[in-house]
């Protein structure tokens, strides 16, 4: 029962709270549709699929590229990919630059990643992608380092209102301990984000992804990395303070659906006798809290060019708590001998945050 109520409150048409209000004091003809909607479930909100992607890397040029699709089998699928260039400003320089152009899936929720359907009404929406560019400059002299980055993206999905994102961040870190096979760093990081529109919700027309109008985060990150002859691992953590400010938003992003809901709310208000109202908007909110993250990754050389690796992570670095994990097996066609990388460079899915 709890799961059904939670789902009805998050997805699709009239939610459970609205329906209870309407049906508690029914207005006959105008509420017949609401009655029908509330009598049925929204359908299962889960999905599965198989992602496909190919990638190319030329380390001597600092060039990387990939092309693929969001998982086939999802309700909504899209082409995704990107290209990046990471090089020093001059040979043997401590200064570097990174340029990245990409189209990526927004994986904050099932709605934003795979899309959703309300079985009561038949409406489908979601499957959001972010297309944009990002640039970074950095300095590292093996005693300390600093970086500055900026990015812009346009976000779109099926029957989802378009949005734009701007981000800016910087940080500094120090090598607290460093030798050939181990390294400890600590520092400070500051990041900021702005979205034109609050698309954080799950009703029809919303994207279901974190999209505050103001987001600021100040963190204290630490990282420990170590390697042996055939293994390498890294543990990372960060704790700090974050501030989130989100505008209020209409219950539906579709103008026709929102207009119909507002008309129904006005009719209810004119006839209700208990003083209750039918909400048609999500409330604005601002909050400050503690942000944290913890992650670990590692890789083992099995021999004959094969490597086994994995990664785990948890964080509340936005407005939700997230747990991630992955395991991979990769094969290198080139010579796989020599020292293991420090820090480890685990495989990253094109769909990872």
Summary of predicted features, one role per range:
Residues 1-353:
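Gram-negative and organellar
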């Amino acid at each position: 029962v709890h799961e059904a109520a939670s789902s009805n409150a998050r997805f699709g048409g009239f939610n459970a709270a609205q329906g209870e209000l309407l049906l508690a004091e029914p207005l006959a003809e105008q509420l017949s549709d609401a009655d029908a909607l509330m009598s049925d479930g929204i359908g299962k909100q889960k999905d599965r699929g198989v992602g496909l992607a190919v990638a190319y890397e030329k380390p001597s040029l600092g060039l990387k590229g990939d092309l693929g699709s969001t998982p086939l089998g999802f309700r909504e699928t899209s082409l995704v990919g990107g290209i990046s260039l990471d090089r020093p400003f001059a040979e043997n320089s401590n200064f570097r630059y990174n340029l990245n152009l990409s189209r990526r899936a927004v994986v904050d929720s099932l709605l934003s990643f795979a899309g959703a359907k309300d079985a009561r009404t038949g409406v489908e929406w979601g499957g959001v992608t972010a297309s944009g560019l990002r640039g970074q400059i950095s300095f590292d002299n093996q005693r300390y380092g600093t970086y500055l980055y900026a990015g812009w993206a346009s976000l779109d999905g099926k029957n989802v209102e378009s949005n734009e994102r701007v981000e800016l961040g910087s940080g500094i870190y120090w090598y607290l301990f460093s030798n050939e096979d181990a390294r400890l760093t600590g520092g400070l990081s500051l990041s900021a984000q702005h979205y034109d529109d609050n698309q954080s919700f799950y009703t029809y027309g919303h994207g279901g992804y974190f999209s505050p109008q103001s987001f600021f985060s100040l963190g204290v990150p630490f990282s420990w990395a170590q390697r042996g002859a055939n293994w390498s691992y890294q543990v990372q953590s960060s704790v700090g303070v974050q501030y989130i400010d989100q505008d209020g938003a209409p219950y539906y992003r579709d103008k026709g659906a929102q207009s119909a809901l507002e008309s129904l709310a006005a009719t209810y208000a004119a006839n209700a006798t208990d003083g209750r109202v039918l909400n048609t908007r999500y409330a604005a909110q601002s909050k400050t809290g503690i942000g944290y993250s913890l992650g670990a990754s590692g890789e083992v050389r099995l021999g004959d060019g094969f490597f086994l690796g994995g990664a785990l992570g948890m964080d509340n670095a936005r407005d939700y708590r997230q747990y991630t994990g992955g395991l991979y097996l990769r094969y290198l066609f080139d010579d796989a001998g020599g020292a293991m990388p420090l820090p480890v460079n685990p495989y990253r899915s094109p769909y990872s945050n």
